[in-house]
């Protein structure tokens, strides 16, 4: 037996030891702990606004921190900033590359970012003196497509990429400050913790990881999914996060318990999940699916509480406002819908 085989066996043994230790530490399950809770009841949301203007598939959206404006990115090569109250377009930004996969709104509202198959994260300034929108910085450095980006503040942004890494950038200098390596597949999504000190990532190696932004270390790895993880989102209190995967399940992982707490699945659901988001309280988990629907889950009882049906194609992205008052879904049908 060669060294490689013995190392593989050793790694497998260690994995099993960790799995068993996690199991032994589990004194109750979420379903048992919440059995006495009242069910939420049926959640029925209506479409309040439809944002029309993109001419092709929408791939990504992100709410601004004012809970009014949002940015969306489409295959039509446009980044549009919308006023969700009036449905007006505040900015329509033509992109150099139309192969865009992600977009982000800075917490200050002064910048938006996007990227995709060009491997570059482009930062656009919305608050120029001339009143026009222009590229304020391009961040090249990833050797694979840009799958997700999120601003820490106006001068720092975290990106995830198909090159199996994530990166923290200094926007002013355009330099990569930290590279986060450890995934063994394309990193598809990231989510910043509420305190902005850590972030989680989901990847095509079917694992999620928790990273420390300050020192670049992987703090924890969460296995469990059986296929690519397409989406991750933090629980509002920062102690847990949810994932959505091509294995047709969403899962809830607890950071302090270091393991999976819950799985959200149904025999009738056989398609992958593209996007996930929590309500402000964390009581609801919203998930967008390849079958054109968005399911609403009771996050504590792991039961389906409702469905948002209104798109004519895959729901590719969704987000809940910071004030918790509305949900936006974006779809390959080229429309964004605002629900509450």
From Swiss-Prot:
Keyword line: Repeat, Transducer, WD repeat
Disulfide bonds, paired cysteine numbers: none
The WD repeat ranges on this chain: 53-83, 95-125, 141-170, 182-212, 224-254, 268-298, 310-340
Presence of keyword Repeat: yes
Keyword set includes ATP-binding: no
Gene3D superfamilies per the UniProt record, alphabetical: YVTN repeat-like/Quinoprotein amine dehydrogenase
Protein's GO biological process: signal transduction
Cited PROSITE patterns: WD_REPEATS_1, WD_REPEATS_2, WD_REPEATS_REGION
Superkingdom assignment: Eukaryota
Coiled-coil annotated residue ranges, if any: none
Signal peptide start-end: none
Cited Pfam families: WD40_Gbeta
Assembly, per entry: G proteins are composed of 3 units, alpha, beta and gamma.
Family affiliation: Belongs to the WD repeat G protein beta family.
Described function: Guanine nucleotide-binding proteins (G proteins) are involved as a modulator or transducer in various transmembrane signaling systems. The beta and gamma chains are required for the GTPase activity, for replacement of GDP by GTP, and for G protein-effector interaction.
Protein name as it appears in the record: Guanine nucleotide-binding protein G(I)/G(S)/G(T) subunit beta-1
Species this chain originates from: Homarus americanus
